[in-house]
Amino acid sequence: TVALRTHLDTFEEPENSPAWIAFSEIQSAWKHRLTLQAVALMALFRVEHDDFDRRCAQIAKRDGVLGAFIGPGSATPERIDRLFLAAARHGLDLDLHVDETTDASADGLSLVVETALRHKFAGRIVAGHCCALAQKHEPEAQALIAGIAEAGIHVVALPLTNGFLQDRKPGRTPRLRGLAPVTELRAAGVNVAFASDNVQDAFYPYGDFDMLDVMRQAQFLGQLEGDPAGWATACNAGPAAAMGLDGAGMIRAGGAADAIIFEATGWTDLFSRTNTARTVMRNGKPLGIETAEQVGIERRRA
């Protein structure tokens, strides 16, 4: 891992936020080893508050990304418009938690697309979750996907968290997978990335920030086994592009020799064994060989 983006619940203004203060300390301590980015995740109604412009200025001062939780029923054209205008005014990229529901009537993503195109927004837009898109009727879904592509929006699908949470009802087996329609999105030219989202918290009590695990579960849930090499970019180059990290996420001539070498004979072998040994390379030098058991031992010591 050479870069990581996290979402900070921003209830207070960033300069008074314990989350932002702690993040700044960690970002400084790790700056020579990791690129850390923070998204200020706020409820969408915050755009109507008098302090929103001040919040955006503080986010920009910290090289942060403007985020918003766009849940069912919260999105209105006026709110989305204010969000985009504030982002443009302060030179902020957007990272949006949008339509995390299997309700096909959710319209947050469609409002984001329409607003981005109308404003000709110059910043980078990331749309995370987008679960409702998979439940829309095919003509409506295809039209919206075309709009996403035209607006240049990056889509981040969360196979672990969304597979765990979506269509969840007590005493009932889920019928729906909750995964955004990643195959259709990629076919339309949209940059698709996979990510872990929650790790060992109330929303997803498992995981350990392992992108191989994310890739494996995306292959299973999305039935992507036909092109594992092609979809691997959704766990490296795709996220790098969504984060604005030019040239990162790929091995190329003249680039940094950062990679992970797995003890596997092929894709099937890699996805079949959860304890595959790996060698982490940074700047062409191995940091060591780890097995899943060794990682677990180190975590328990910590």
Predicted regions and their residues:
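Divalent-metal coordination cores built from histidine and acidic residues
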Residues: 1-45
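Active-site-proximal loop/turn and secondary-structure-junction residues that shape catalytic pockets
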Residues: 10-12, 40-45, 72, 100-104, ...
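Short glycine/threonine-rich loop-to-helix capping motif typified by GTGT followed
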Residues: 13-19, 169-170, 205-209
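Histidine/acidic residue-rich metal-binding segments in metalloenzymes
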Residues: 18-33, 48-126, 130-154, 171-194, ...
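Conserved, mostly hydrophobic/aromatic
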Residues: 59, 66, 97, 155, ...
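His/Asp/Glu-enriched, well-ordered alpha-helical/loop segment
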Residues: 93, 114-125, 165, 176-262
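Active-site clefts of carbohydrate-active enzymes
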Residues: 154, 161-163, 167-168
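C-terminal cap of metal-dependent C-N hydrolases
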Residues: 241, 253-302
